[in-house]
Amino acid sequence: MATINQLVRKPRVKLVDKNNVPALQECPQKRGVCTRVYTTTPKKPNSAMRKVARTRLTNKYEVTAYIGGEGHNLQEHSLVLIRGGRVKDLPGVRYHIVRGALDTAGVKDRKKGRSKYGAKRPKA
């Protein structure tokens, strides 16, 4: 335990929280334009072709965002909405594209977890 004198000379340092999504600048989502849509491979031990998009945000940041769900309609110059949330097996991918917002279509024939993929409720 530090003495009062020690604390007067050198106070305790406050821990600073690390921001995992700096490009959002404290906003819940940001709009952006796709500059490149491509696939990439995950880290070991996983194997797949993950769909990602390099996106230029309205605040001039350029980030890589993951396109979740099966199939997508994105191409260069598509308007997208970006939210936070990293992809654990893709280094450098710290953002997700919101499905069903702006130019991004929802996932077709999605029955469960529809709200996460912008899918409408199927007709009875």
From Swiss-Prot:
Gene3D superfamilies membership: Nucleic acid-binding proteins
| Region annotation (Disordered) ranges | 105-124
One Gene Ontology BP term is:
translation
Write out the biased-composition intervals (Basic residues). 109-124
Question: What InterPro entries is this protein classified in?
Answer: NA-bd_OB-fold, Ribosomal_uS12, Ribosomal_uS12_bac
Q: Which GO terms describe its molecular function?
A: rRNA binding; structural constituent of ribosome; tRNA binding
The alphabetized UniProt keywords are: Methylation, Ribonucleoprotein, Ribosomal protein, RNA-binding, rRNA-binding, tRNA-binding
Q: Superkingdom, according to UniProt? A: Bacteria
Cysteine disulfide partners in this protein: none
The record's section on SUPFAM superfamilies has:
Nucleic acid-binding proteins
Per UniProt, subunit arrangement is:
Part of the 30S ribosomal subunit. Contacts proteins S8 and S17. May interact with IF1 in the 30S initiation complex.
PANTHER family in the record, alphabetically? 30S RIBOSOMAL PROTEIN S12 FAMILY MEMBER (PTHR11652)
Q: What is this protein called?
A: Small ribosomal subunit protein uS12
Species: Dichelobacter nodosus (strain VCS1703A)
Gene name on record? rpsL
